[in-house]
Regions:
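ATP-binding N-terminal substructure of ATP-dependent carboxylate-amine bond-forming enzymes
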Residues: 1-131, 135-144, 148, 160-161
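A charged, well-structured terminal subsegment
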Residues: 153, 158-161
Length: 161
């Protein structure tokens, strides 16, 4: 560690947010497993938080135990004790540095909704902000913004379902 630091003050809490209500729920659980396996637990206090398909937020205790044992399943289970995001994130932020890593796919995850919640809670997160996330989910709106800024793009035809 630089300057003789023991690294204790360099630790931050990393909330892995995964699962979700979209059709891509299972893909998100697999993504979370791979991120959890790759994160250096010497530098982060990792809190896996799952959202089930009904929208309930839970502390994924089984993932924490499996990670500690070095025996992660192929996909993380998003269930466990209830985890109310706003008060819990406020508590974590008051205790020290915290960042949320949203691993949610599809609507209600990467469309700006979770990013908006985190910004309202004043909690830093990994990834694009509210506007860019919502634009990325609406491909036609994104192309219209690109056109307004004279950015080149492939020809396209917009279809509305």
């Amino acid at each position: 560690m630089p300057n003789g630091s023991d690294g204790a003050q360099d630790r931050r809490t990393l909330v892995l947010l995964f699962g979700g209500r979209s059709a891509e729920h299972d893909v998100s659980c697999v993504s979370a497993r791979h991120v959890l396996a790759a994160v250096d637990a010497d530098h982060y206090d990792i809190i896996p938080v799952g959202i089930d398909t009904d929208g309930r937020w839970s502390l994924a205790e089984a993932a924490t135990a499996a990670h500690a044992a070095g025996d992660l399943p192929e996909a993380l289970d998003p269930t466990g004790p209830a985890w109310d995001p706003l008060p819990r994130l406020a508590e974590l932020s008051a205790a020290g540095p915290v960042v949320v890593f949203p691993l949610l796919h599809g609507p209600l995850g990467e469309d700006g909704t979770v990013q908006g919640l985190l910004e309202l809670a004043d909690v830093p997160y990994v990834g694009a902000g509210v506007l860019s996330s919502s634009l990325a989910m609406d491909k036609l709106a994104a192309k219209e913004v690109l056109a307004q800024h004279d950015l080149p793009q492939a020809r396209y035809r917009g279809l509305h379902a």
